[in-house]
Amino acid sequence: MEQLKKIISNIPHEIKIIRPLKKGLISEIYLCNFNNIKSVIRLDLETPDWIKIQRDSEIRILDLNNNHKSEKNILYHDLEKGILIRRFIEGNKFNLNKINSDQQLELLGRAIKEIHKTNYEKDAINNFSNAINRYKEILKYKIQKDPILEIGFKMYEDLNHESYPKVFSHNDLTQENIIWNRKYVFIDWEYAGLNNPLFDIASIISSYSLNDQQIDSLWRGYGKKSDVDDAILRKWIKFTYFCDYIWRICLIETSIYDEKFLNLDDLKKNLSIFYKFV
């Protein structure tokens, strides 16, 4: 708490911490008042350079988003000190309600489509391939010793050569990053950038374990089912699990965390079922 007070005291604005919201692997998040605006402050823990690069990308994305809105969402940031303050978004983490799941998923599909229609200058935003290449560089001495890494990177190489046009994508559509309050709001944009649109769709499918009927509802909202090769989509779904593993191994290699802390054994067991199908 003393460290938190010290950080707050060096921010040239009036800030009052209300309560902690979340402590993650790389950051702590608090509800606060910032100049009498209900807000969220995210304080990065000691983070490796590859995460700082993604934070820089997030700030640029949020600044671009600010330019498209009359009311600014991002209120303050200091990349060097790992500080981000944004308006608090009212709502709840989106949980799939089985009673209304078809309607919910159609609306979610439409919301994802709106992300993918966003038109930013290509040189202003990150490219997902750059992130994968950074992971590959970090893990270059481990890939040949770890079949999961080898399969994961090879799978991405194959998928990245598919003919789908790259679009602006969120690239981290997990349950933690989707909020519902009469519409969908997406948070945590540090991985956002140009990517195959199927990665966002696949992330939703794997995160919520959607069945075929639910996937059809998601596509109805998105409006592109007829153009999609189901085999390619299934491969992207598999890749989301490998991507999670790659990210965790990068964190282990560059931070204080170990395999046990990051529950790597459970993820390895889940990934093992894919080996014979890759």
Spell out what each predicted region is.
Residues 1-12, 118-171, 175, 265-275:
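An alpha-helical support segment within catalytic cores of ATP-dependent transferases
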Residues 12-20:
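Conserved N-terminal boundary motif of the eukaryotic protein kinase catalytic domain
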Residues 19-125:
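ATP-binding pocket architecture of kinase catalytic cores
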Residues 28-33, 40-41, 156-199, 213:
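Active-site acidic catalytic loop and adjacent metal/ATP-binding pocket
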Residues 58-59, 102-103, 185, 202-205, ...:
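Glycine-rich, phosphate-binding/catalytic loops in enzymes
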Residues 69, 112, 116-120, 159-160, ...:
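A general structural signal marking secondary-structure boundaries and capping sites
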Residues 198-226, 238-256, 269:
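Active-site activation/catalytic loop segments of kinase-like enzymes and analogous catalytic loops
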Residues 258-265:
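Short, charged, amphipathic alpha-helical segments
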